[in-house]
Each structure stands twice: as C-alpha cells, then as structure tokens.
Amino acid sequence: PETYYTALGSLKNLHIKPEDKILVRAATSGVGLAFARLAKAQFPDVHIVGSVRSGSKQFLLKHQAYDDIVIDQDGRLETEEQFDKILELVGPLTIKDSFDHIAPGGIICVTGLLGGQWELESFNPIEEIKNNSFMTTFHSAQVNQELMDELFDYIDRYQVDVSPRRVFSLEEVPEAHAYIEGKTGFGKVVIINENKKEKYDEKD
C-alpha cells in the first residue's frame, strides 16, 4: 500500500479544493496514477492534467482519472497554463519549470525523484519561488499508522479503484521488469504466486 500511502500524504499536503486545476508531473507513474484516483474520488470536479514525455499514452491516462495531458519535453512543459496545485514526481530536475507554471497562492508538493537528480542546483528561493506560492514535500520512509488507517478508510469511503495495472506470477518476474521499464509500462504491477494469481484471474 506504500504507493497509495504516498499519494494520500501528498494529496493532504496540497490542500486540494473542488475548483482546483492540478498538474501531476510523471502522470503514468504509480504514485501519479494513485494520486489522480484518490483526488477524483473525493473531488470529482477538479481538473487533473498529467505530464508525459509522449502522447502515446493519452488514451490510457484519460481512463485513469486524468482530464488532459501536457507534453514534458526535456524537463519543460509545452504549455503556458498555470495550475493551482502541482504534484512534482520528477523532482529537482523539473522543480524550476514547475514554479513557472504555479498560479498565485498555489502549492507544489515534491514527492518523487524520478528525474534521477537528488539535489537542487543553483536554486535561489527568493527568485525561483513566486510570491504567494508554496513548496512542500511528502516522504514515505517513516510510516505513520494513523495516516495508514486513514488511507484504508478513504479508499472504502470514496470507493477508490486500487486495482494494479498488471498482475504477474513469480515465474514472470523478468516479463514484469520488461513491462515496467518498457515504453508500454504504466502504473504499478503486482507479483504473486501462481495459485493466488489463478484465483485473481478467475475473479476478473
């Protein structure tokens, strides 16, 4: 449940409002998809835009709680839009560009490091952080039981679909890695033993 735990912690830190326009950078990531599902379940009228590096997954994203997509070309969004809230999953590599797209009074929550860069370089907070905008973070290394309980209650109350994208058996671990790392990779997968996988497939 760590993926949804991280997504819920980020959602709470962003203080979502029903009228918000939200950007999720790295929309096809597991946390990105979980966040979009959680947000739409409680706030069905929010407008969620996901950033992707190509438009090939647009159809899939629009069936996973996203309203629109924007192309992220080499760490820069190909849009002039501004957003009330931004979930930053790429990390320090794109934070400066995210601040170029935050609306007055907006919040950026830095949760991921998918860009492979761990630290901010040449970052002047007075210049980079817009007036009346905010940056926060969420880190799931220290699990809080109260938040974990809140997660399961949230999923039950809002009937959130938490099913994984794909299910693999133990023997299919190489295929699972290939799927996640390939161009068709999308969201999270689950590895289970063969007997349980057969029961899972029967339910579908």
For each feature predicted by the language model, list its residue ranges.
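C-terminal capping/lid region of NAD(P)-dependent oxidoreductase domains
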Residues: 157-166, 175-204
